């Protein structure tokens, strides 16, 4: 069993990483006769790197983590920081994504009549619409039906039904039979799946069936920051008319066919109409990252409705990238918290916050807004749960109510506010989702389904246990100490 583990893909990957780290550690040892010169040079370099870190753009929490590494391990930390910030692969992906955004821009134009109506309805949301459209290229749409799914089982059943209707193309991880019917099927999944879930040759296997398959951001046995930037998006597009967004992955536990951490609570939304066009472009942008040319994007677009349906409100599909210097998911969450009048209700599996998000949550609560966060009671990652609990006391004392889902694990990523605004997607309240991963979501305003999101929140809340300050203080010594220590490296979690 030991040798099987060592010579597995994961084992070999870890061994190669360790070899590279040993090289970093070994160089100073073997050059010890030049130690005085080397360490003098490294001291100067350490100061230069620290000054550089302080003056770079970015989240202060990440800066503090890097500074801690450089000061605690001057040689290793300094060399490692320089190494990871001089990688060409990261720059290539960044430049390629920027170019693809330019290519898809003509297909994601903003209808000014829609934004004029939104300004008349709610100016604050019109400002968010302007930001998402003008800074990032994500238009606001009307004429889009929304259907909310309170559990993964409902989303999966709906998705199977819609996939059966496909006549032209499907962007999803599925459907050998549909390929035989002449439907174009594309399947893209994150490279982390090949680490322990799927064979490395899985794309070739699907390609034999006629399914176009890609592994996004392959795991490679080299120390590289880009391996931190996982594709966490969940998108399904069918014929350019129907799309799915949410937290539900394609695995048995997400539809409670397999129990891992009690009942798995997850959510998703179906979009049908004009807004699906953005989902199509978001998918194709990611698909084309490692291609030389560009897609004939026009063939995947459907004609927009000519008349406006006021009853359906406004829908903005959006995506987040770690390479565009815009923290889109976090900005959407800030917007909802800062413009709420009555309440903000949140479901998230993780709670690892920077100071700005922590302050915004507490400020909203102190302003008279009912802020409630539902967390899992049975976590999937004990260490992330330990860190999350280090925020509980400050949040509760600041007026934020925290509940834990007694039946099991909450994987939903939902904000709902004031019976008229909601966002559902893949974006957790942690550093990885907000800053490091490729993510996506949909902002919904003045659509009847927002009421269903709030109804689901209340139904879920009825199954939860309210966390008190006394309970937080009395948690186990191990979890308390582990959480406080791990919080030092929270930006890496």
Predicted regions and their residues:
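A short, conserved beta-strand element enriched in hydrophobic/aromatic residues
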Residues: 266, 347-348
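Helical hairpin unit composed of two closely spaced alpha helices linked by a short loop
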Residues: 340, 350-372, 376, 381
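Generic enzyme active-site microenvironment
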Residues: 188, 347, 374
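Short Asp/Glu-rich motifs
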Residues: 197-199, 225-226, 355-356, 383-384, ...
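C-terminal structural cap/anchor segments
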Residues: 369-429
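N-terminal localization/anchoring segments of enzymes in phospholipid and broader phosphate metabolism
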Residues: 1-330, 335, 339, 363, ...
């Amino acid at each position: 069993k030991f040798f099987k583990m060592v010579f597995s893909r994961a084992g070999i990957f870890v061994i190669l990483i360790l070899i590279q780290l040993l090289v970093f550690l070994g160089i100073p040892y073997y050059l010890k006769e030049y130690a005085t010169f080397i360490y003098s040079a490294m001291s100067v370099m350490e100061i230069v790197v620290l000054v550089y870190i302080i003056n770079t753009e970015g989240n202060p929490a990440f800066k503090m983590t890097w500074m801690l590494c450089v000061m605690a391990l001057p040689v290793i930390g300094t060399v490692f920081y320089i190494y990871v910030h001089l990688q060409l692969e990261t720059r290539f992906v960044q430049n390629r994504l920027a170019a693809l955004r330019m290519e898809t821009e003509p297909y994601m134009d903003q209808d000014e009549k829609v934004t004029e109506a939104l300004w008349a309805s709610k100016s604050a949301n019109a400002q968010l619409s302007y930001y998402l459209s003008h800074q990032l290229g994500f238009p606001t749409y009307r004429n889009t039906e929304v259907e909310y799914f309170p559990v993964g089982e409902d989303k999966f059943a709906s998705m199977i039904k819609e996939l059966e209707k496909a006549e032209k193309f499907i962007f999803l991880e599925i459907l050998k039979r549909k390929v035989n019917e002449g439907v174009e099927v594309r399947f893209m999944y994150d490279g982390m799946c090949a680490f322990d879930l799927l064979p490395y040759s899985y794309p070739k296997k699907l390609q034999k069936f006629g399914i176009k398959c890609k592994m996004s951001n392959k795991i490679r046995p080299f120390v590289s920051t880009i391996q931190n930037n996982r594709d966490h998006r969940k998108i399904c597009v069918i014929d350019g008319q129907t799309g799915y967004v949410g937290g539900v992955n394609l695995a048995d536990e997400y539809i409670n066919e397999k129990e891992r951490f009690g009942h798995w609570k997850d959510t998703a939304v179906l979009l049908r109409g004009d807004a699906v066009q953005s989902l199509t472009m978001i998918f194709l942008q990611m698909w084309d990252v490692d291609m030389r040319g560009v897609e004939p994007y026009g063939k995947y677009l459907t004609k927009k409705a000519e008349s406006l349906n006021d009853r359906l409100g406004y829908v903005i599909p959006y995506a987040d990238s770690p390479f565009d210097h815009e923290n889109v998911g976090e900005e959407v969450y800030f917007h909802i918290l800062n413009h709420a009048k009555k309440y903000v209700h949140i479901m998230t599996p993780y709670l690892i916050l920077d100071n700005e998000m922590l302050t915004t949550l507490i400020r909203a609560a102190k302003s008279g807004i009912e802020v409630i966060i539902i967390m899992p009671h049975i976590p999937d990652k004990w260490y992330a749960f330990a860190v999350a609990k280090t925020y509980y006391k400050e949040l509760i004392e600041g007026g934020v109510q925290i509940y834990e889902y007694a039946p099991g694990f909450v994987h939903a990523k939902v904000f709902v506010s004031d019976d008229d605004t909601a966002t559902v997607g893949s974006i957790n309240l942690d550093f990885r989702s907000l800053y490091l991963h490729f993510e996506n979501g949909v902002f919904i305003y003045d659509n009847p389904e927002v009421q269903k999101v709030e109804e689901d929140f209340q139904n879920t809340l009825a199954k939860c246990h309210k966390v008190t300050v006394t309970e937080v203080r009395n948690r186990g010594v191990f979890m308390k100490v582990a959480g406080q220590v791990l919080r030092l490296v929270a930006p890496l979690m």
